Amino acid sequence: MAPSDLSSDLLARNRVILMHFDTYSASLSFVCWDDSTVLWPDALPDWSDIPAPADAASAAYDGEAVRQALIARYSFNPGELVRISNFDHWAQTESGPVRIHLLRFNTFQAPKALLEACDGSFQNLPELRRADKQELTLLRQVFNLFIGGSSKG
């Protein structure tokens, strides 16, 4: 999935949840990739939540680099995609820690056609109820962040 100039290590150590939040209607939707996962570039194999590792500040987990990789891969408008820095989640996999980032389209409407051209589709939580249980737990945390009274990101 990644362009040849992107580090495979960067993509192996990071995942992205891509979402849109309509502040007018309080509608929250997530991008589901290939009708199978909400994590970009791939679903995670078996994993468990962990606290941030000691090397969390290293370039291997840089949220802006991950954001730029997604923008480069799909030619997204950089001004329309923001990183939600107060969403900071980590997963332990067989190959090591993976950071999970949250990126939000700040457009008036979700760019559905743009994502459909990238094999993604916007879906709300009820539409994702068959998703991986661990992914649903992450989406619930995003829901709580935006709708449940936490900071609006």
Sequence positions of predicted segments:
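Active-site-adjacent beta-strand/loop module that shapes the phosphate/pyrophosphate-binding cleft
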Residues: 79-81, 85-121
